[in-house]
């Protein structure tokens, strides 16, 4: 399970680097709790990802530690992981580390989908 979770996180991080927004969007369920907002539609998530891509066209993300499983049931799992980032847009840049939290459920085809995402600054 740990290897599968690490592979999932790696694929999610790589999708966040892809200039094609659809790559990352495919990970999300049709409705998600999105950075504190409840029941956000996939269309709103897509608009947010487009804005983020426009604001930070050059970005790097990488896993910076272990994945911590917080809760697991038969069809769902909640976990957190440390994520480092470097963002750039011309002369503007930002970098740091966040603790990213994801909640996943198994979809109809047994593919895991994100139903909640959030993050907080890591110390």
Residue positions per predicted region:
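Short solvent-exposed beta->alpha transition segments
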Residues: 25-62
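Acidic surface patches and DE-rich sequence motifs
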Residues: 29, 87-89, 107
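A mature extracytoplasmic/lumenal domain signature
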Residues: 28-31, 38-39, 67, 81-85, ...
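Short beta-strand edge/turn micro-motifs at domain boundaries
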Residues: 94-123
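Surface-exposed, charged secondary-structure patches
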Residues: 50-94
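Short, low-complexity N-terminal intrinsically disordered segments enriched in polar/charged residues
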Residues: 1-18, 26-30
């Amino acid at each position: 399970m740990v290897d599968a979770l690490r592979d999932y996180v790696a694929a999610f991080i790589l999708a966040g680097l892809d200039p094609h927004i659809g790559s990352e969007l495919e990970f999300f369920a049709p409705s998600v709790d999105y950075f504190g907002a409840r029941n956000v539609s996939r269309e709103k998530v897509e608009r947010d990802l487009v804005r983020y891509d426009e604001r930070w066209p050059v970005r790097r993300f990488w896993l910076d530690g272990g994945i911590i499983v917080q809760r697991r049931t038969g069809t769902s799992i909640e976990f957190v992981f440390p994520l480092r980032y470097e963002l750039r847009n011309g002369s503007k840049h930002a970098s740091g580390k966040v603790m990213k939290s994801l909640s996943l459920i198994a979809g109809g085809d047994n593919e895991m989908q994100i139903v909640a995402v959030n993050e907080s600054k890591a110390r």
